């Protein structure tokens, strides 16, 4: 029995022993056992407190659910509803205002187009003073922009943009081309290329025409010079008649025979030509070969008349110089021309 009572005392707390009023101090073994058993008791108390808190929160949730159910209950139409948050009402009003603003913005471009159609002049173009002030928009950096009705809304033309380029004016006709030119003018190349495509075409054509004119002029001068060579026998004959008026008839006929023939268009030299067959040669050696092969030297007879006649034939009618060969005389006559 004594052992059973000791175990019961050890299981009971110190408060029970103090309540009995015995006032006897506890033994150290019993006190150690009580200290070991104390955490279990405190944990049990904490579990009780947690259960009480959970029950309180459940009760609070129930009250909130009841409040929400009361708010969701339908009410009579004449009877005002319960206090609802005013934020929802303000949000719906704001959405309604934004929708109305968007509808106004969608209707506004049509009105602007109607105004522009009314302001158009009979030719279908807007004058610079007829543009309404609503078309002028000021941007943030101070530049003024104009919204044209024909262009889309995204494109805006600046009021300070560069003016359109004027079509190029036709250049004045040259006085050289006014005399014999067509109605279209020399600067229009069969309707394909105009002066706008090729600048300075009129000046170029005038320069080319003048160049061709001077070429023709020099060519005509060259032709006249060649004609002077071709028609040279008559002036040379007159010159011989003036210089030697006292010469006899055989000398005049001989000088006429020694004059150079008509030159070809190749411009061969007048010194290398044959007086007998009227052939011209480029080189003097060719003329010598021709004279030796075709025109052999004639043996002069003892007749003095024939010798005198030969001397008269081979004498220069200008300076009266005598030559042994006929081609020498012809070369000398070329120096007098």
UniProtKB/Swiss-Prot annotation:
InterPro entries in the record = TR-Histone_Methyltrans, Znf_C2H2_type
UniProt GO MF annotations: DNA binding; zinc ion binding
| KW Zinc-finger (keyword) present | yes
Start-end of Polar residues biased regions: 1-10
**Gene Ontology process terms (BP):** negative regulation of DNA-templated transcription; oligodendrocyte development; positive regulation of myelination; positive regulation of oligodendrocyte differentiation
Q: Which domain of life is it from?
A: Eukaryota
Q: Where is this region: Important for transcriptional repression activity?
A: 69-184
Concerning what turns on (or off) its expression, the entry says: Up-regulated by OLIG1.
Keywords attached to this entry: DNA-binding, Metal-binding, Neurogenesis, Nucleus, Repeat, Repressor, Transcription, Transcription regulation, Zinc, Zinc-finger
> What Gene Ontology cellular component terms go with this record?
nucleus
Per the record, the zinc finger regions (C2H2-type) lie at 272-299, 314-336
SMART domains assigned: ZnF_C2H2 (SM00355)
Q: Position of motif Nuclear localization signal?
A: 295-302
Where are the stretches annotated Disordered?
Answer: 1-32, 55-83, 146-179
Cellular localization per UniProt:
Nucleus
Cysteine pairs forming cystine bridges in this chain are none
Return the similarity comment: Belongs to the krueppel C2H2-type zinc-finger protein family.
Q: How does it assemble?
A: Interacts with OLIG2.
What does the record give as the function of this protein? Transcriptional repressor. Plays a role in oligodendrocyte differentiation, together with OLIG2. Mediates Notch signaling-activated formation of oligodendrocyte precursors. Promotes differentiation of adult neural stem progenitor cells (NSPCs) into mature oligodendrocytes and contributes to remyelination following nerve injury.
Report what the protein is called: Zinc finger protein 488
Which species is this UniProt entry from? Mus musculus (Mouse)
